[in-house]
């Protein structure tokens, strides 16, 4: 596995601690300890869920491209793009509803769309590189 990707994956595994801590934040929002309106509650849940799912997907993509024998450069690029989406998407959900009582998402919602584009790019790169590795092995 590409050493840079190995370092990125190690850092990613450590960030799961932060995602778990985010779960305790959601518990405090849910029981009313942290005040939040309905929009904030919905967006906080969406941000937390996307963080967990996209980190898991990014780790899976990294392992899958490596095991399939995909080009190390392309495999790394695809996996890192998926992991970047795991930053952009949740950040957009959380940061777009900051404030005492937002009624609609703020400008940081653009980060969700940037993350979605990054996710699609990473999945296409990874999918094509895994497919190419498979075809080369036939």
Give the residues covered by each predicted segment.
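Polytopic transmembrane helical bundles with strong interfacial aromatic enrichment
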Residues: 1-138
């Amino acid at each position: 596995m590409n050493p840079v990707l190995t370092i990125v994956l190690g850092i990613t595994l450590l960030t799961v601690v932060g995602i778990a801590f985010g779960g305790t934040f959601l518990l405090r929002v849910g029981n009313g300890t942290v005040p939040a309106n309905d929009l904030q509650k919905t967006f906080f849940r969406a941000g937390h869920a996307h963080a967990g799912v996209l980190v898991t997907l990014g780790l899976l993509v990294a392992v899958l491209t490596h095991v399939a024998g995909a080009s190390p450069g392309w495999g790394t690029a695809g996996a890192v793009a998926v992991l970047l989406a795991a930053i952009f998407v949740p950040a957009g959900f959380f940061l777009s509803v900051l404030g005492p009582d937002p009624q609609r998402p703020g400008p940081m919602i653009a980060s969700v769309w940037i993350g979605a584009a990054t996710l699609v790019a990473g999945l296409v790169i990874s999918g094509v590189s895994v497919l190419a590795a498979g075809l080369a092995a036939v």
